[in-house]
Each structure stands twice: as structure tokens, then as C-alpha cells.
A protein has these predicted regions:
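N-terminal pre-domain segments of enzymes
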Residues: 21-54
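Well-ordered beta-strand positions
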Residues: 82-84, 129, 138
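Bacterial N-terminal signal peptides
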Residues: 5-16
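Structured catalytic/translocation cores of nucleotide/phosphate-coupled proteins
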Residues: 11-12, 20, 122
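Surface-exposed beta-loop interaction hotspot
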Residues: 131-156
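Forkhead-associated
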Residues: 49-50, 55-125
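Short, surface-exposed beta-edge/turn micro-motifs
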Residues: 9, 78-79, 143-144
Length: 156
């Protein structure tokens, strides 16, 4: 009888130990995932840096932080430039001379914009950067929008 009781006690203790190890491993996995998620969210271009989504209209769209623009941004120069959305869905940007913006890290005055739906493994969507903010074009069922991010957004 004592022998059976010892066997049952040892079996229960063994299961509890294995179970505790599994829980510790599971908890550690959750904590690692959580830390990685927070890091991705708070990154300079993470989701918490999102400050705007502005839909483009066909034709010329004046973009900047001044109230007289077609698309008013919450960050950046008063007059950033003009984004033109053609009837075939192609887009082009012409930057204002005083915008001090870059396109894909280069100081150019105009460029064709590639949206996220037409990006490839070798070519990301075109990124227009100005100060701590930037935007790239998204395509949602044929609608084109500017996804605007700021690395200094209060939400980060």
C-alpha cells in the first residue's frame, strides 16, 4: 500500500514538474512575442508612427501642411508639392523647390510614385521624406492614398 502511494505521489510530482516547465516555456514565448511586437509598433516607421491617411483624387493634388492645399498634412512644409493621379492609376510627384524633401533618399525634384500594390521584392513603394515625416502610396481596390508617418509622432 505504501509502495503504491509512493508511486502515485512520484507520478503526480513528475507530471507537475513537466507541466510547470511547459508553462514556463510557453510564458517565455509569449513574453518574447510581446517584446518583439512592442518593438515593431514603436519603431520609427512602425504603426504607432502613423499620423494620416489621405486619399488622392484624380488629377493634381497639392500636398503640404498649409490650409490652402488639397491634402493638408499635420507635419512637413507648408507646400510639399503636387501629386498627380492619372486616369490609368499611375502617379507622379513634383516637389516644391523649398520643400527640402527627398524621394527614396535622393534629392530629386520629381519622380514616378510606385504604390504598395505594385512594389516588388527588389523595389519598395516610393517613399517621400520631409523632416521627421514621410509618406508612401497605398492602393486599396484601385483607390490611391498617402500613408503618412512621423518618427516623432506623439503616439510613439
Amino acid at each position: 500500500m505504501l509502495r503504491n502511494s509512493l508511486f502515485v505521489a512520484a507520478a503526480i510530482l513528475g507530471v507537475a514538474t513537466v507541466h510547470a516547465t511547459d508553462i514556463d516555456s510557453y510564458t517565455q514565448g509569449i513574453q518574447q512575442w510581446h517584446a518583439g511586437r512592442v518593438e515593431r509598433l514603436t519603431a520609427a516607421d512602425g504603426w504607432l508612427s502613423l499620423i494620416g491617411l489621405e486619399w488622392l483624387q484624380p488629377g493634381a493634388n497639392r500636398v503640404g501642411s498649409a490650409a490652402d492645399n488639397d491634402i493638408v498634412l499635420t507635419a512637413g512644409p507648408a507646400h510639399l508639392g503636387v501629386v498627380t493621379l492619372a486616369t490609368d492609376g499611375s502617379m507622379r510627384i513634383v516637389l516644391d523647390q523649398d520643400s527640402h524633401a527627398t524621394i527614396d533618399g535622393k534629392a530629386v525634384s520629381e519622380a514616378v510614385l510606385v504604390d504598395d500594390a505594385h512594389a516588388t521584392a527588389d523595389a519598395a513603394p516610393t517613399k517621400v521624406a520631409f523632416g521627421t515625416a514621410s509618406f508612401y502610396v497605398i492602393d486599396r481596390d484601385g483607390r490611391k492614398g498617402l500613408r503618412v508617418k512621423d518618427s516623432e509622432a506623439p503616439s510613439r
